[in-house]
Amino acid sequence: MKKILIISLLFINVSTYSQELFVMTEPASNMPAKSFGIRNMNALMFEADGKLNYHNMPELMWGINKKWMVHAQGFISNRQEGGFETEGGSLYAKYRFFSKDDLKSHFRMALYGRYSLNKADIHQQEIETMGHNTGYEAGFIATQLLHKVAISSSLSYERALDNKPNYKFPITESNSAMNYTLSVGKLMLPKVYTSYKQVNVNLMLELLGQRLNENKKSYLDIAPSVQFIIKSQARIDLAYRQELYSTMIRTAPNGVILKFEYTFFNAFK
């Protein structure tokens, strides 16, 4: 009886968490405690001249407890001459500091931070420490789950540093920015949960924006996506990111994002 209760509680927790797994952003909720995850993000981004940029970002994730989780991520791309090259990596941590749970809803708030190293050339005004710039980001996330609909928003400060050893950040450009996001997702299938083996299908729409602090240049992107959760452990995401407007130089803002993820529950004692 005790074993059945534990399995049931884990199923409820995982099913609820799976409704908040946004493609382009992180929710305030954490992955289940003592779990371990692997993720691989593939981005096919289109430059103005028609050239295709491919970025691969493998990632390891650890749910330390219900409040803390950490990620380690690598950056690989074909932007440099000579084919694919490992350009850098990052460490990410998130602390969930507030939770309010009701019968069919909950509200979460979290703080997060990222520190990245990157050796690639600095080729745009946009600041992006996830794959382009050496630097750091610190921010706040709030996520509301209302039955089958999840709404999440974030605000963060991002700072770019020199891409050592060869590329200094241009002194004529803004080296810091404020980022803001709004994500909405809805569970489309299944209509009723009967088994953890059911495939979850989520549809999402996300808005992603940035405003440079010194020169006040900005952009806003939109990213519709579809997500499949298989047996509550495997995840497949497909999204398209499209620039709505921009007053800054961005090398390749539009493109397709494909993610694969797998979570190992109770991987640590």
Give the predicted meaning of each segment.
Residues 4-13:
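Sec-dependent N-terminal signal peptides
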Residues 18-163, 171-269:
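Transmembrane beta-barrel domains of Gram-negative outer membranes and organellar outer membranes
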